[in-house]
Amino acid sequence: MSVKKQLERLSELGAYYHKNGWMPGTAGNLSIRIPEESGFWVSGSGLDKNLLNKRNFLYVDLESGKPVDSKNIKATKGLKPSAETSIHRAVYRALDGVGCGLHVHTLESNLICANTSKNEPIVLFELPAIEILKAYGIWEENPKVYVPIIYNFPNVQDISDCLEKYLKEYRPHVPFCIIEKHGITVWGKDAVQANRNLEATDFILKYMTSWKSFSYSGEPRKLSVSDVLGQDRREIFSVEFPVYPATFY
């Protein structure tokens, strides 16, 4: 599929997500990466997602993180990349085979609280072992599946740095992460798969925030990432990654 067609498809998804309440105001951003290219396309800053078109996307160099000219499509004059562009860049730099990133601000993702902090910027959150996990290719019976929740640093680059370091060192169980009190970033090999993963993720978070018994009090149990993922003990941020059963606002 041509770049033009892919950006038109992302524009359609932006309108759909805006209608669903996943991209309220001008929140969120969408991106694609063409295999073997040195950059990626991402929606510009401050745009209403129900009004996107192919010229509302900038081409960003993967290494520098800066917008560069593209021979394919000329972006709208004066368009600037969102600060959250660095989140998309982190995923593309850390994981092979990713061709689409979707960053949205769903209500349910903002309700989940893991008590992250600057000193404990990532915790692992256990997902319920329900049927929809098969959308991610997880077919085991009663699997133990965890998603990283990242502290919502004021500087988005700090969020991106945490995410990239985590993804590079540990194979993620699922194709998404949660940024606490902020939103979710979901990815896939292309827009079709990424959208499917986003729909599954939204269902899971709705399920969790609707299930009252998922609300716990008291101290969470803590495990290191290596304990959870069954790898050699390694600490990424020189602190343990706690696993929270779940708490909601």
Swiss-Prot record:
This is Methylthioribulose-1-phosphate dehydratase. InterPro entries: Aldolase_II/adducin_N (IPR001303), Aldolase_II/adducin_N_sf (IPR036409), MethylthioRu-1-P_deHdtase_MtnB (IPR017714). It comes from the Bacteria. Keywords: Amino-acid biosynthesis, Lyase, Metal-binding, Methionine biosynthesis, Zinc. The keyword Cell cycle does not apply. Zn(2+) binds at H103, H105. Belongs to the aldolase class II family. MtnB subfamily. It comes from Leptospira interrogans serogroup Icterohaemorrhagiae serovar Lai (strain 56601). The gene is mtnB. Its cofactor is Zn(2+).
